[in-house]
Amino acid sequence: MNKKKILVIDDEEDFGFLMKSFFKTRNFDVYIAFTLADGMRILKEEKPDVIFLDNNLPDGLGWGETEYILVNYPTSQLNLISALNIPKTSTSSFRILEKPLRWEELNEMFDSGSLPQKRVS
């Protein structure tokens, strides 16, 4: 079995590197993109198991890609993140996380099994 892949698409470099450090210690392969274009390129190349997608990116609105991701990568777990204007939704297709993220929240996701642990080849 291979490591699970996580893609973080967020223009805040510090946040991206913190997320990478957090998940690498839990044995994930972590990819970071600071623009929507780079994120979509990595998404197509790596087909990650888990995606953390910010909304306000320098080259567009990340959440505008939600439908595309859900349709074309149905096995990827999508987590939308933002510090602004968090909509209330009842969909089970993705999770919405509000910045600043709490490490306890990520630990709970990991410990509860809501983040996949290993990739099945």
Question: What are the residue ranges of the model-derived segments?
Answer:
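Two-component/phosphorelay signaling modules centered on CheY-like receiver
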Residues: 13-31
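The feature encodes the CheY-like receiver
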Residues: 58
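Active-site residues of response regulator receiver
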Residues: 54
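Hydrophobic/aromatic residues positioned on beta-strands within the core alpha/beta folds
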Residues: 81-82
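Acidic catalytic/metal-coordinating carboxylates
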Residues: 35, 61-64
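Acidic, metal-coordinating helix/loop segments flanking the phosphotransfer/catalytic sites
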Residues: 32-50
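C-terminal output helix
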Residues: 101-121
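Short amphipathic alpha-helix used as the core "switch/output" element in two-component signaling
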Residues: 41, 63-74
